[in-house]
Amino acid sequence: MKNNMKKLRLALFSALVCLFLQSCNDFLDVDPKHAASETQQWKTLEDTRSALMGVYGLTRAALADNNTHWICGDLRKGDFTVYKRSDLQAVSDNELNKPYDLLKKVSNWRRFYAVINAASVFMEKAPRTVELDRSYSEQNLKYDIAQVRALRAFAYFYMVRIWGDVPLVTYSYDNGTFPSMLRTDAQTVLSYAKAELLTAIEDLPYQYGTQTNLYYGSYGAQWQGKLFNKLSAYSVLAHICAWQGNYAEAETYSAFIIDHASEINAKYTSIADLTSETGLFYSNASVKGSRILGFNFAHNDNEATQSGHLEQLTLAYPLVQKSYPEIYISKDSLFSIFTNFDDLRFGIIDTIKYSSYYVQNLNEETPVFSKIKIIQDGSAKDNDFGVFGSSIVFTRLEDITLLRAEALCALNRSTEAVSYLNMIRTNRGLREVSFKKDFGNNRESLIAEIFEERRRELMGEGWRWYDLVRRQKLMKDNEAFLRLISSGGIYWPVSEDIITANSQIEQNEFWK
């Protein structure tokens, strides 16, 4: 088994190098230099394994590169305060067209099209391997095609949230010719992504492989929290629908996930497992099944890195040898967000002492947000080197449960919504609430509290900005934010490098 996993890690490294060179260089930039020569590939099971892991690796890189997942999701008008970095401050202030290198890199969507192209190449060429290598079965091919189809749809959803309209490319461009392409309406792209996910779901399993029928040398729990499974696809579907304001479907999909969570061993995560160095964000955690969709940086697989992790921005002494974090949650924000002293995430313990599950160094000017702190392999005692192995967790059961509460409330099923809100509250030490007694049967008050609970529970997980957008579409209680939505200001500007290379790409109107 260990030999198989070693081969898999080597395959991943090879695939990342190969696919990145083939897929990322000037994709969609009308450049004939992009040509993929694959005459030596797609002959064996090892070839398909390398290519599949490569698509996962490129997806992980797209989210982690320049800390995109947190820059776009948590920092923009979020709860984090910036400590002496003007580029990060520009993001926080929504001044995304400032001439900083970080902003230029984040605004370039090329890395996402590397994922899309690699997935398309796989779907077009992997079927030939079934004919050439008898060890690569039709069932194996179905699983693999379903995964890359889902990853491609996920990439499109992720891009739409950042840029709005994006070019919709449904087949590979590995022949060296890239026509100039217009941006496609965001709703058309999301409809395509939903259709692709529904197609993928037909072949995606809850678990991969069995003891008698291994999937690439492993089975069951060994793949948990690592690969796109049936519930991973449903979770992306649920979020696409919520982003569209289609709460009827969002409720249906989120309900399915909750009802079938045991199929993938997903459970509600205790506060200890959520914040432990070997808990949910640790790649090989005992609770890894609760990562409904995540992307790992396993230290033991030589995947841990210095960049591409929240810890790079948030940790400081005594956890790492760094005087100050680059971003932090101020004391004022902590006390205004966590208003209940019984809250296990940030509340009072031992009469006068605050819980340290989310924050350390509370007595200092800049508290350290330590909810996620996977240093090296999670057991590092020598913290001189800032190398991190935390997984990017896109969604977990708490997120989906609160999303269902949001959907139910939007559908005027408020009493049901409260029951799902209470599932999260009681797991974090808070009392149950009543729609009548605590919210006066006021739906808007309940919606506001559901988003406040998401704010507390998902802090530092890349959700705050997108939650603010959805909240405002429902609540409509902030005129400035509503103008931002109507004017397209909720999206990022498109990189000038992209516009220069493709004359048909126009800048988002708000950023012209």
Positions of PLM-derived features:
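Elongated scaffold/linker segments in the mid-to-C-terminal portions of large proteins
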Residues: 103, 256-416, 472-512
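Short, surface-exposed recognition loops and adjoining beta-strand edges that mediate ligand/DNA contacts
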Residues: 39, 66-83, 207-309, 435-444
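Membrane-proximal, proline-rich intrinsically disordered regions
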Residues: 24-76, 96-102, 254, 479-512
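Conserved, well-structured interaction surfaces
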Residues: 49, 57-59, 87-163, 178, ...
